[in-house]
Amino acid sequence: MEQGMDYWLGQIQQKDVGKRLQVGPDLIEYLLDRQKSIDLEQDQTLLDRMVDGLATSWVNSSNYKVALLGMDILSALVTRLQDRFRTQIGTVLPSLMDRLGDAKDSVRDQDQNLLIKIMEQASNPQYMWERMFSGFKHKNFRTREGVCLCLIATLNVYGANSLTLSKIVPHICNLLGDPNSQVRDAAINCLVEIYRHVGERVRADLSKKGLPQSRLNVIFTKFDEVQKSGTMILSTTDKNFDDEDSVDGNRPSSASSSASSKAPQTARRGVSLGTGRRPGTSSAAPKTGGTAKEGAGALDEEDFIRAFEDAPTVQIYSSRDLEESLNKIREILSDDKHDWEQRISALKKIRSLLLAGAAEYDNFFQQLRLLDGAFKLSAKDLRSQVVREACITLGHLSSVLGNKFDHGAEAVMPTVFNLVPNSTKIMATSGVVTIRLIIRHTHVPRLIPIITSNCTSKSVAVRRRCYEFLDLLLQEWQTHSLERHVSVLAETIKKGIHDADSEARIVARKCYWGFHGHFSKEAEQLFHALESSYQKALQSHLKNSDSIVSLPQSDRSSSSSQESLNRPLSAKRSPTGSTVSRATSKSTTGSLQRSRSDIDVNAAATSKTKAASGASTAPFSSVAALPPGSYASLGRIRTRRQSSGSTTSTASTPADTRGRSRAKVVSQSQPGSRSSSPGKLLGSSYGGIATGPQRVPQMPSEKRSKIPRSQGCSRETSPSRTVLDRFGISQPGRIPSAMRVLSSSTDLEAAVADALLLGDSRNKMKPVRRRYEPYGMYSDDDANSDASSACSERSYSSKNGGIPHYLRQTEDVAEVLNHCASSNWSERKEGLVGLQNLLKSQRLLSRVELKRLCEIFTRMFADPHSKRVFSMFLETLVDFVIIHKDDLQDWLFILLTQLLKKMGADLLGSVQAKVQKALDVTRDSFPFDQQFNILMRFIVDQTQTPNLKVKVAILKYIESLARQMDPTDFVNSSETRLAVSRIITWTTEPKSSDVRKAAQVVLISLFELNTPEFTMLLGALPKTFQDGATKLLHNHLKNSSNSSMGSPSNTIGRTPSRHSSSRASPLTSPTNCSHGGLSPSMLDYDTENLNSDEIYSSLRGVTEAIEKFSFRSQVDLNEPVRRDGKKESEMGSCDAGMASPASDLRGGTDMVEGGRMALDNKTSLLNTQPPRAFTGPRGREYNPYAYSDSINSYDKTALKEAVFDDDMDQLRDVPIDHSDLVADLLKELSNHNERVEERKGALCELLKITREDNLAVWEEHFKTILLLLLETLGDKDHAIRALALRVLREILRNQPARFKNYAELTIMKTLEAHKDSHKEVVRAAEEAASTLAGSIHPEQCIKVLCPIIQTADYPINLAAIKMQTKVIERISKESLHQILPDIIPGLLQGYDNTESSVRKASVFCLVAVYSVIGEELKPYLAQLTGSKMKLLNLYIKRAQTTNSNSSSSSDVSTHS
């Protein structure tokens, strides 16, 4: 009877030793016979149980014969299952580790052999050893010894390349101190074996491990003995890193023969690259300078792009789901002890999430920043598979996110650069391709210093690569991205031109011409600074180069040259360091590429010249004789405009190269047709530009001969005929551009009909016409008229040449979307043209198409080609939103936030106008409440850090939204409250008056939109926010009332129209508000039925309501509350406390009469009890939690601000002209860096006023004074800076409580003043800092100072420590205890500072701490060395003797 798995499982589980020994050999025979054990692989559960039984019952048996037999059975299983046994390794490994410590030598040897066999057949050495680290800490000393012996055996079988030895060496070092001598000896032997395979790096590594010198001496002696014995076995990866032949895994000049010599010499099997193909065999056609040249394992950009989508499909259900996925990925990647396959899976999952739309979630970029460390760790991994996947993922992130990947790119770039000299091809080429992809897609100026710093590397290979990267950067990036680092680029290129390596010099000369295209003036200065031999080399490089990228790009468009259009992404460098001329090779192979000159004007120009340049035998012959000043002919061809504002259309391409194989039929113009075209005027005004050398290789003569020449009086004579004519560039022997390719009369008729229809539609709808043309290229009317020649070039072409064929097939949406998603900017632009045509034809997109288009548009917001693609994208976006607005609700958040962010970018004025138009259309297309909620969410999002321009854009948008919203759209939610509180803080933005004004206008607009709801919202905010908003609203209402009394005709109601197109100008600061008339935003305020008395009554209601919600935040708001008429008169003082002293305060008694309802009938909720509730019967309702941020020493001040005096006497004590004086002083102080003497006088006057206790002045002007003073600290004149600090110090003395909300800003600015070069300013800053330390609450002060002490440089850290010392002298012991963990690290860091003054200040501060808390400080000083501790004790004793009245734990809390 034939036994199956069930039978053998029963035999394995039996306990009888005799039967086990009898059954064992039969089981081995069964397992090795595939016919008998055919069911072995069919039932995984039975197999798992069988392996588990063998590991626990047999291998762990106390009978050594059974243990040996168990290992033999496992060995048979490994032989049978091979790779499939890997899943069982975790089951058997613990038992095998235990057996390494068996008392029997035969068991230990058999165990070791089995482990080696598993490494070879079922797994690989690294996989196994990552799971065997626990053996180094095993409780059995024989096991610890056995693990070391097993490592020696592994090295002898597989070599050092198979293991990440850096992870194993620390475990071995720990065993050097093992209590057992056998283990210690085994550990030393292990290190010696590693030294045999790795070499001197082990010696250097051990020196850093902190081992005792005596032990190191023993080990190093053994190393020397091995070296002398001649038994060293060095692997290829361990050669000197400066060896040119082994450094660069991707050298362009390395021959294929050298690649074979560097093949890995490990015995282990090759591991698949993870993409289901072998390297070097993925493409049937050989690549130019491709894999054969790079060597086995090399990768290129094509491999990367294919691998981008080689990731499992995942779905993202929510932002929470995304966050959890990224957290798991970070956890795996941050720990290199995880299985390498898990780490590869984690890296692939990042790509999966990207493909699933992770970038659309708000929290993605915050989580991505947290992955920087994990990416760096993965890129440094010793396993090439992990490095490869890490590099692919980084490249994918860069290509998808573009400039949004700036932080990640900057973080990982140095690590990726370290891969370039790696001798392992797959690692070196992965690093190179990653850097190229990052340079192509992430145009961040901060990357430039990283690249240029590597241009001075000791490694020749790295220098060569860096200059190639620099060349690519100069081709791909726009000029504005490079401007910040012009000098660095120039200096780097200069070093490259002088480089010792000839190939590096060649590439550096190429970089020079790229640099010249961006910064011709600086390039010419660099040229003059070079020796004559180098100047000649530069000129001869330009003359002789076959490269089509050796010249600067037209308008920095890399894609406008043939180099970018025909280049596959994996374009390799030729041995000379230049790119192989692609146009020529393409023509010979017959694979025709689409010309892009129908999109870009400069590409059209080059295509024309390409055909014409064949007549000149030496196109660069005149360059060498040119002086540097004449290089303008080599630079960019710029589009110049006529005074009429129109520019001419571009010519179509020389030949249609869309891959059609049929014969080309060229349509010719008739003689005399349109020879007097109005476009002729354009060319005549642009003379004098000589034909510059072109970047396009000459077209073969057989190609040119197929293009018929225009004869006689044809339009060849028309100056508008070609782009070159229009720009006044002369050319020898021009030929006309080829017409569109038409294969039949049917095609011709269709093309004519389309051309006429397009022309007709453009004449009827002028605005629409622009959407078919690239930004900034508007044709003359003649070009688009119905009367144009049917066969003319312009009849077939839109502004940029031939209409792409899919424009006539509007149904082909997929092709349009594919073009829009292309990585080539010109294809993206072509796609946008097609999309505009689709939208114009009212072709509605399906839900799937909409989703994909939204994803594409999300990426386009970061498109780097602002002149070319982004501008057209904005035009298309407007049409898209108008047509599909009902289906875009889910995409509104991205749309709105991205447009607002773009308003903060440095864009051309015309592009910014298009962004504004897109915002206007968005505002009118979607529900207002939804937009408002999105904006509130965006404002409070902690991951967003909008710059000042973006803040202004957000605020202006909210203001315009509030004008059109219904009152019910404004909802008092927690998100809205947070957003409003942030807007209130923006009203004091120190860096921008625009932000301050815009924030004030928004608060007023929201107040006017829904007064009751906004009042309730304010009541729920902390008191500081309430005060700021209430004061602003009070001033607004007061000014509105004064203005409306002066010009009653201006008092109009709110505009009810939802689509109002009028936009209000920003409101000026309340203190500077004109009283003569209403600002546009004030006009909307509903004052139609209110006279002056009613407005004051309204104000009382508002302020009273705010006070109510402050003191009764826990009481049900709907509970009817009686108004106490006796206390109503107190509200009159609100006006006195908040209004401008210069305001007209007539009718003070009228204000307190009548007890009117607030604003309108909807505000009945605002009838509340007076603000002094906590002194009356309702005191029990006071909620201390709402005032938890108050500090005891400021309770009086807070009370004074919250409760106003009974009458207006306080204000009447202040002369009205006094406030005018302050306003004049502030106006004078705002003249920064001008009128020095006048401002000195103003500061002196302000110094006098600060010494007067004038509450009303400070109530109104404090913020403005403080901001102006802090701004004045950056003045050019040192005397003014010093004077500003003295005024600040005086205010600190007299008004300390007011600095509570500005402590951090004031402290930072004061400390920064210590860096001043003038002693007078530094002295004033020291005095101000000293006063600050005594004026601001100690705990608040220390919280600000601690991070400064830890991060700032000298002398700021010194000033901060001194200031902290003064603060500590006045803090209580209990409070100091709580913040001690924050204080001590910075002081210990200062104790180690290189500046002696910082060390001394740190010691004094520690002494001050000791004087407060005494011996309790000692535990925090454990890391101090003995000498430092002695010094500290010396100072402590000296302080105690100096102040004999104070004990070691004296309490100075009374000062606080």
Swiss-Prot record:
One GO cellular component term noted in the UniProt record for this chain: spindle microtubule
Compartments where located: Cytoplasm, Cytoskeleton; Cytoplasm, Cytoskeleton, Microtubule organizing center, Centrosome; Chromosome, Centromere, Kinetochore; Cytoplasm, Cytoskeleton, Spindle
Biased composition (Basic and acidic residues): 1121-1130
UniProt keyword Cell cycle present: yes
BP GO terms, sorted: cell division; establishment of mitotic spindle localization; microtubule anchoring; microtubule nucleation; microtubule organizing center organization; mitotic spindle assembly; regulation of microtubule polymerization or depolymerization; regulation of supramolecular fiber organization
Subunit and partners: Interacts (via C-terminus) with clip1/clip-170, and cenpe.
Name of the protein in question: CLIP-associating protein 1-B
Native source species: Xenopus laevis
Name of the gene this protein is made from: clasp1b
